[in-house]
């Protein structure tokens, strides 16, 4: 078995190292990650300049001076001799639930695997601290082992969020849907030393839909949240109404 491992926190991130060590007994693991922290990079590709790949002298991890998506793209299309059995991303420093998934570089790295027909799993640790990172890595390895032993049909994309709890306090796995957040806080406006305005993106909004069945609800109750995602963004329930709307508009012109 072969696993391609990436993340969005960068190749020096503790979450990447912990997940690598947890996955090594399960498969041959190649690491290709961004050189820098790319949180919030989403599915962006670097198209305006060439990319360079380096290798850490201490860990052997490969890293690219680009985005999480760049990392997986370069590995799959330019470095690996054969397609891996699984792309794994994480462990992220902080949750990726609800609307977070649209911005997440962690999820994006996994998504790039799906783009090339490779099943993928993204792992995130709820709350921005590493207090129970080794426990989270243990859970991640259990999920990966279960997938390798019992693959889901097709090319699944799973988004996994692990509560920041000791292993013994975790209550199991829950399959969930994405919750929803309130809009993020307004940007923070400051003045730089030259007297020019600068802006910081505000904090993420609180949970709006954290009802039973959502990722927010499951992790708050101590469960590991597993949410199957898809690339098709088509709003199928709006197709009929949109056809009627478009037909009325084209007939009026």
UniProtKB/Swiss-Prot annotation:
<dbReference type="InterPro" id="IPR036523">
    <property type="entry name" value="SurE-like_sf"/>
</dbReference>
<dbReference type="Pfam" id="PF01975">
    <property type="entry name" value="SurE"/>
</dbReference>
<dbReference type="GO" id="GO:0008254">
    <property type="term" value="F:3'-nucleotidase activity"/>
</dbReference>
<dbReference type="GO" id="GO:0000166">
    <property type="term" value="F:nucleotide binding"/>
</dbReference>
<dbReference type="InterPro" id="IPR030048">
    <property type="entry name" value="SurE"/>
</dbReference>
<keyword id="KW-0547">Nucleotide-binding</keyword>
<dbReference type="GO" id="GO:0005737">
    <property type="term" value="C:cytoplasm"/>
</dbReference>
<feature type="binding site">
    <location>
        <position position="92"/>
    </location>
    <ligand>
        <name>a divalent metal cation</name>
    </ligand>
</feature>
<dbReference type="GO" id="GO:0008253">
    <property type="term" value="F:5'-nucleotidase activity"/>
</dbReference>
<comment type="similarity">
    <text>Belongs to the SurE nucleotidase family.</text>
</comment>
<dbReference type="GO" id="GO:0004309">
    <property type="term" value="F:exopolyphosphatase activity"/>
</dbReference>
<protein>
    <recommendedName>
        <fullName>5'-nucleotidase SurE</fullName>
        <ecNumber>3.1.3.5</ecNumber>
    </recommendedName>
</protein>
<keyword id="KW-0479">Metal-binding</keyword>
<feature type="binding site">
    <location>
        <position position="8"/>
    </location>
    <ligand>
        <name>a divalent metal cation</name>
    </ligand>
</feature>
<keyword id="KW-0963">Cytoplasm</keyword>
<feature type="binding site">
    <location>
        <position position="39"/>
    </location>
    <ligand>
        <name>a divalent metal cation</name>
    </ligand>
</feature>
<dbReference type="InterPro" id="IPR002828">
    <property type="entry name" value="SurE-like_Pase/nucleotidase"/>
</dbReference>
<comment type="function">
    <text>Nucleotidase that shows phosphatase activity on nucleoside 5'-monophosphates.</text>
</comment>
<dbReference type="GO" id="GO:0046872">
    <property type="term" value="F:metal ion binding"/>
</dbReference>
<keyword id="KW-0378">Hydrolase</keyword>
<feature type="binding site">
    <location>
        <position position="9"/>
    </location>
    <ligand>
        <name>a divalent metal cation</name>
    </ligand>
</feature>
């Amino acid at each position: 078995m072969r696993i391609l491992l990436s993340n969005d926190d960068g190749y020096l991130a503790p979450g990447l190292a912990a997940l690598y060590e947890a996955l090594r007994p399960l498969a041959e693991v190649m690491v290709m990650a961004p050189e820098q922290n790319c949180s919030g990079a989403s599915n962006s590709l670097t198209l305006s300049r060439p990319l360079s790949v380096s290798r850490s002298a201490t860990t052997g991890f490969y890293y690219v001076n680009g985005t999480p998506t760049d990392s997986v793209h370069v590995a799959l299309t330019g470095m690996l001799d054969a397609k891996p059995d699984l792309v794994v991303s994480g462990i992220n420093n902080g949750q990726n639930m609800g609307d977070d998934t649209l911005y997440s570089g962690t999820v994006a790295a996994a998504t790039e695997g799906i783009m090339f027909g490779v099943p993928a799993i993204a792992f995130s640790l709820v709350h921005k601290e590493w207090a129970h990172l080794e426990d989270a890595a243990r859970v991640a390895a259990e999920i990966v082992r279960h997938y390798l032993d019992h693959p889901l049909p097709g090319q699944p994309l799973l988004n996994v969020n692990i509560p920041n709890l000791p292993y013994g306090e975790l209550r199991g796995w829950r399959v969930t849907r994405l919750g929803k957040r309130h809009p993020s806080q307004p940007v923070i406006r400051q003045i730089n030393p030259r007297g020019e305005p600068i802006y910081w993106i505000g904090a993420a909004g609180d949970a709006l839909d954290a009802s039973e069945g959502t990722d927010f609800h499951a992790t708050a109750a101590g469960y590991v949240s597993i949410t199957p995602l898809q690339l098709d963004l088509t709003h199928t329930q709006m197709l009929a109404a949109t056809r009627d709307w478009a037909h009325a508009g084209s007939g009026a012109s």
